Amino acid sequence: MYCVLMKQESIGFDNRWIRGGKKVNQRERKKRTAKTESAVKTVEKAETVKVEQTKKAVVKAAKAEKVYNTRFEKKLDELRWLYMELYGNSSMFAELCDQMHRFYEERTDVLKKLDSKREADPDWYKKNDMLGMMFYIDNFAGNMKGVESKIDYLEKNNVNYIHLMPFLDTPKGRSDGGYAVADFRKVQENLGTMDELEELTGACHEKGISVCMDFVMNHTSEDHEWAKKARQGDGEYMSRYFFYDNSYIPSLYEKTVPQVFPTTAPGNFTWLPEIGHYVMTTFYPYQWDLNYRNPRVFNEMMYNFLFLANKGIDIIRIDAVPYIWKELNTSCRNLPQVHTIVRMMRLISEIVCPGILLLGEVVMEPEKVVPYFGTVEKPECHMLYNVTTMATTWHTVATRDVSLLKKQLDIVNGLPKDYVFLNYLRCHDDIGWGLDYATLKQEGIEERSHKKYLNDYFQGYTGESNSRGVLYNEDPVTGDARFCGTTASMCGIEKAGFEKDKAAMKRAIQMDVMLHAYMFMQSGIPVLYSGDEIGQVNDYSYKNDPDKVQDSRYIHRGAMHWDLAARADDPKTVEGQLFGQLDKLEKIRKKEKAFMTNADTWTVETWDNSILCIGRYYDGDKIYGLFNFSEYDKTAWINERDGLYKDLITGQEMEAAGVNIPAYGFYWLKKK
């Protein structure tokens, strides 16, 4: 009965009991088949995508390899010739080439793209919007992360190039302000990490800001791994420095090599009693000079250079360039081999990381500075500091006489336009009075007495001075010394603020702004020192710090006062007046094409020793800058009668002839 019923039910209901099961199974099989086919398609699609990605990666790698090979083949012959001339070691050269390729492969796609962009526009850093700012990371914002959080402030300052003062690992109390490096691949722990450096450079690049750092090539800290092994008597590492087991060779060097710090670190060698050897220490006893006669030293330092470049650094400041090659019976300064090394460094960077710029620190007279540009055909440094012009500017402030400054600018303006100087009023270092004393002597001014006058003036010891500051590394025998102080303090802002003298403050601010306006008119790239934009004065707290008290340069290395920076938008404050006027100058400079770095630049006779006139011309635009370095109103007796000019600051129209200029005043006159 059950079977019959089921049969009837199955007949009555389309055989669902018997055939329905088959239908369910068929549907399930179809679903499973569909899922399988879908999964297969997904896998096939993923494999296709993977294959395509692999193909793209292969094509991309091949393209990158082709780019590298093109650069390498173009530079190889000269690089090999220079290397073999200096070292004659083919195996070390082969190693160098292998490592260059490795560092190129490790360079990120973002940096490679930036390299290509800059290769296509080699004058990218010569634009009229290029404005730098230098600062110590801890003083400015505490650490790397802090700097990253202040990028908006940098943009507010119209800055698109920052120089991070030395931040690599150094021993506490023996750092020379960061220039005694113990590890070239480690950031000082209190400042951050290499990863955070890379994050900072990446964040800066997103905002169009280039990043500069110091690369100390001449020496390492005595705490460097090499120095530690050398101190243990390891010959391999001793050969990376200059070691001597008696005083004979050191005494020969001392006959011809000048002392850098005759009072604080006399001599050029330090005795190490634990190993019974002398080691060369041109700067401080804890900074051991590297021996670049050893190709291992050159190679390893280039690897450090490329490592840092791959962290996103755009500008490498080569510290103490003239000192890096040593020869007996010479001054060990500016020797030909130095130029060979810098040229090789330029070639290496153009192969591996052509977006990098080399900035040379050559604190010497102009005729010794200029050769570090190399030649137009075989360039060395992209940029050099305009050190002598900076010192001559402050000489002009103290004497109210622009004659020497005009001559100095004429020398700079007469150089090829490919040569780019970094112009600044103040930096982290002292001011050494390395002026053109041969010219001054023709005016009856003697070097020794004039240096004393300048140091007295800027310390505020002369009646006509409103400056404040201190001496550095004074030599009691010769009376020679260098000077330290911030721009604002040297202009009189510190004194006027202390004395609550409103008239003096107005005059000091006017001088400060005039000097910046003059700096912006020079041929080259202007660089601000952090704090100058708000008129920070000398910081005397260093005298209470046992690690700093012996180094008076810390007077102008004070921490950034963010409470003062908060007043930058208030025109009633000193900070607001300075910031607002500098901001206006910077924006005008960015707008006017006559401020391009490679514009024609020249000086014009004003027939008044207190007034400087600088002319600039580019692509049909002409601007004259007139600057009064005197506390009295003056007249510039220029006679440019080719039509009306417009002052870019006030909008006033006038002829560029017989121009009256107020005390510490200036004009930027553009031909209409």
What are the functions of these language-model segments?
Residues Y2, K7-K672:
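Active-site and adjacent substrate-binding regions of carbohydrate-active enzymes
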